[in-house]
Amino acid sequence: MIEDETKGENKMNRGRLILTNIIGLIVVLAIIAGGAYYYYQSTNYVKTDEAKVAGDMAAITAPAAGKVSDWDLDEGKTVKKGDTVAKIKGEQTVDVKSIMDGTIVKNEVKNGQTVQAGTTIAQTIDMDNLYITANIKETDIADIEVGNSVDVVVDGDPDTTFDGTVEEIGYATNSTFDMLPSTNSSGNYTKVTQKVPVKISIKNPSDKVLPGMNASVKISE
């Protein structure tokens, strides 16, 4: 009887040992797989979530001083280059024309308002050719070339991954264009990783994608 119980306990112990070994093996394999995936991702892609949706923008401006008239385009309306969108009535009546194809995204004036030459009537953006501006670390920029494919996810449409292509790589870091570049009078220099702007085209963005939205990009090396 005691011998049978001992045999039963030994079998249970062996079973627990086998189960423990199996679980340990699964954990080890999961760690190896995770490490391999991380290595593959880090060596084959450049990623950043420091990116925004952008589009070519142009202001429709008053060509002369006077009062605005015949301005009846709401935000969201499209215009073509050369379209007469309003008139300025001053010493003479002058047409206000759009300087590019685009969509009205912000109205700046109302009919009857007095404006000076150069006053912005409205802001337009080319919504048909939106793109991504991504800031890439200087340590990663050598791994990127024009023509590289890109996976783009926009925060405004997070369930969709858009196809993209690297179109342009900046010739200077963002800090180069700071109005007041930092100076260091103490003599102590702190090295900061710089960012280079990269322009990425987006193929067939949805209506949910709007200029200024945040985005994440994964660029194939």
From Swiss-Prot:
Spell out the subcellular localization from the entry: Cell membrane
- Bilayer disposition of the protein: Single-pass membrane protein
Note the InterPro entries from the entry.
Answer: CusB-like_dom_1, MFP, Single_hybrid_motif
Q: Name one Pfam family in it.
A: CusB_dom_1
- Bilayer-crossing residues are 17-37
Q: Mind listing the UniProt keywords for this protein, alphabetically?
A: Cell membrane, Membrane, Transmembrane, Transmembrane helix
The cellular component terms of Gene Ontology attached to this UniProt record, alphabetical and capped at eight, are: plasma membrane
* Keyword Transmembrane set for record: yes
Signal sequence region? none
Taxonomically, which superkingdom?
Answer: Bacteria
The family assignment reads: Belongs to the membrane fusion protein (MFP) (TC 8.A.1) family.
Please state what the protein is called: Putative efflux system component YhbJ
Q: Name its species.
A: Bacillus subtilis (strain 168)
